[in-house]
């Protein structure tokens, strides 16, 4: 296989989106549209990816990083003009070049690989990715000769009655012989009503030069959907979501109700895990085998080991080890690590906390900036008092400790191994190993107190 290059057009402003965010940066299933395109190219081991930027160039660069090459289109003079901005980076190279659009996020590596294979088998100068639609109104039509080669692409407004009856359309996606592309591109003129340079003219230029131009029909036309407004964005989101769900289910994941579940592109889930309705799995979240996620679990960049149960809870930038349970109604904030066979129960908040194996924080507690050992019990209502108004301080609770209900651990403080903290205590000094710490007022009972107090309706003597 020859060397593969790609030009991705991402210079348009996208006024129909009616947004401050540049069009190609609008997300589909958690990832900017243009990132989907670049990632697909990267998965195909494309050697050179040149992204043509214009409006929002800095924002696009910030999202995509430095793994691609950028070409700047300062003036918007048409698609051929946009492609030509990549010439300094590609025109002297051998091989095949893809032409793609940053607002066409659904194209799969399977489809593009098939396009590439067909292009090389046909030894064509250019191969057009086409699609057959039930209603082709508004699209450029593919006109073929008797041999099935592409003669020309006719825009809808310029098409004859017979040409308008053609349902095979130009998707705008191409494979080119790289050297022939740049030679033909130099011949494109702007003698049209809009005064712009159109990349579709390259097909005619190549044909006039006696070159072979063919078309490859996409098996799934929906993959070629371009996004120009919020309606089409929602359609792309729905398609991508279905693709993601189908992939996970075919790999052995049970998704009870795909219509009420949201899973982003880069999420990984192992077999025999069950995802319940209302769950959101985002970012770089990974879920092991035999887990139960949801209902109503919201996980962002979370590492979940096998056999974990998470329900009605929010977890962000954290990790939970095998056979643990989280929820219902827990909030696990960034930097938290939950050990194996641990329990994080209802209305518990963790922040930058390390929870040991077999430790239980069953309910109504805040554990922040803390390291809790193995086999610890944190009683209901326990608070790590970590903030003095300027600095966050650390709380350490060692293995086997028992913290009674409604205790305050005022950091920095350490509770020793197998130590006890009596319920209702405010601990502001270290507790030695195996000790019992009691930090509360001794109870005093005032005998016959009630009879001495005035009450409504009670006659005073």
Curated annotation (Swiss-Prot):
Record-linked PROSITE patterns: HEXAPEP_TRANSFERASES
Binding site residues for UDP-N-acetyl-alpha-D-glucosamine: 9-12, 23, 73, 78-79, 101-103, 140, 155, 170, 228, 333, 351, 366, 377
The organism's place on the tree of life at top rank: Bacteria
Protein name listed in UniProt: Bifunctional protein GlmU
Protein location: Cytoplasm
Subunit details: Homotrimer.
Pathway info: Nucleotide-sugar biosynthesis; UDP-N-acetyl-alpha-D-glucosamine biosynthesis; N-acetyl-alpha-D-glucosamine 1-phosphate from alpha-D-glucosamine 6-phosphate (route II): step 2/2; Nucleotide-sugar biosynthesis; UDP-N-acetyl-alpha-D-glucosamine biosynthesis; UDP-N-acetyl-alpha-D-glucosamine from N-acetyl-alpha-D-glucosamine 1-phosphate: step 1/1; Bacterial outer membrane biogenesis; LPS lipid A biosynthesis
Annotated InterPro entries: Bifunctional_GlmU, GlmU-like, GlmU_C_LbH, Hexapep, Hexapep_transf_CS, NTP_transferase_dom, Nucleotide-diphossugar_trans, Trimer_LpxA-like_sf
UniProt source species: Brevibacillus brevis (strain 47 / JCM 6285 / NBRC 100599)
Gene Ontology molecular function, alphabetical: glucosamine-1-phosphate N-acetyltransferase activity; magnesium ion binding; UDP-N-acetylglucosamine diphosphorylase activity
Keywords: Acyltransferase, Cell shape, Cell wall biogenesis/degradation, Cytoplasm, Magnesium, Metal-binding, Multifunctional enzyme, Nucleotidyltransferase, Peptidoglycan synthesis, Repeat, Transferase
Major localisation: cytoplasm
Gene designation: glmU
Protein's GO biological process: cell morphogenesis; cell wall organization; lipid A biosynthetic process; peptidoglycan biosynthetic process; regulation of cell shape; UDP-N-acetylglucosamine biosynthetic process
Annotated segments matching region N-acetyltransferase: 252-461
Region (Linker): 231-251
Reaction equation(s) it catalyzes: alpha-D-glucosamine 1-phosphate + acetyl-CoA = N-acetyl-alpha-D-glucosamine 1-phosphate + CoA + H(+); N-acetyl-alpha-D-glucosamine 1-phosphate + UTP + H(+) = UDP-N-acetyl-alpha-D-glucosamine + diphosphate
UniProt lineage: Bacteria, Bacillati, Bacillota, Bacilli, Bacillales
Binding site for Mg(2+): 103, 228
EC numbers for this chain: 2.7.7.23, 2.3.1.157
Alphabetical list of SUPFAM superfamilies matching this protein: Nucleotide-diphospho-sugar transferases, Trimeric LpxA-like enzymes
A family per Pfam: Hexapep
UniProt region (Pyrophosphorylase), positions on chain: 1-230
GO cellular component: a single term: membrane
């Amino acid at each position: 296989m020859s060397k593969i290059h790609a030009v991705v057009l991402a210079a348009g402003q996208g006024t129909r989106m009616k947004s401050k965010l540049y069009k190609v940066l609008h997300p589909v299933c958690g990832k900017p549209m243009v990132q989907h395109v670049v990632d697909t190219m990267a998965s195909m081991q494309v050697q050179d990816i040149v992204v043509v930027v214009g409006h929002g160039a800095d924002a696009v660069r910030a999202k995509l990083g430095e793994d691609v090459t950028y070409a700047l289109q300062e003036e918007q003079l048409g698609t051929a003009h946009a492609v030509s901005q990549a010439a300094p980076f590609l025109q002297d190279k051998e091989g095949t070049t893809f032409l793609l659009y940053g607002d066409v996020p659904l194209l799969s590596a399977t489809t593009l690989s098939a396009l590439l294979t067909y292009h090389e088998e046909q030894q064509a100068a250019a191969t057009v990715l086409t699609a057959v639609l039930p209603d082709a109104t508004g699209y450029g039509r593919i006109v073929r000769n008797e041999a099935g080669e592409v003669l020309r692409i006719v825009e809808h407004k310029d098409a004859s009655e017979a040409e308008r009856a053609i349902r095979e359309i130009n998707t705008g996606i191409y494979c080119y012989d790289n050297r022939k592309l740049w030679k033909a591109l130099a011949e494109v003129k702007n003698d049209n009503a809009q005064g712009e340079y159109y990349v579709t003219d390259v097909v005619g230029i190549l044909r006039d030069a006696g070159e072979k131009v063919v078309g490859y029909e996409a098996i799934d036309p929906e993959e070629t959907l371009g996004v120009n407004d919020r309606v089409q964005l929602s359609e792309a989101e729905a398609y991508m979501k279905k693709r993601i769900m189908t992939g996970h289910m075919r790999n052995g994941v049970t998704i009870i109700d795909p219509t009420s579940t949201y899973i982003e592109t880069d999420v990984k889930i192992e077999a025999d895990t069950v995802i319940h309705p209302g769950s959101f799995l985002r970012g770089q979240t990974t879920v092991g085998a035999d887990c139960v996620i949801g209902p109503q679990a919201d996980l962002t960049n979370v590492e979940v080991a096998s056999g974990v149960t998470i329900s009605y809870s929010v977890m962000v930038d954290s990790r939970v080890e095998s056979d643990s349970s989280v929820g219902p109604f827990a909030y696990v904030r960034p930097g938290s690590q939950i050990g194996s066979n641990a329990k994080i129960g209802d209305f518990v908040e963790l922040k930058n906390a390390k929870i040991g194996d077999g430790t239980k924080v069953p309910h109504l507690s805040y554990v922040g900036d803390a390291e809790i050992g193995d086999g610890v019990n944190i009683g209901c209502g326990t608070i790590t008092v970590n903030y003095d108004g300027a600095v966050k301080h650390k709380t350490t609770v060692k293995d086997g400790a028992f913290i009674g209900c409604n205790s305050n651990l005022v950091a920095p403080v350490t509770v020793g191994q197998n130590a006890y903290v009596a319920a209702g205590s405010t601990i502001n000094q270290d507790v030695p190993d195996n000790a019992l710490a009691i930090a509360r007022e001794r109870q005093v009972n005032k005998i016959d107190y009630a009879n001495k107090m005035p009450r409504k309706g009670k006659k005073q003597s």
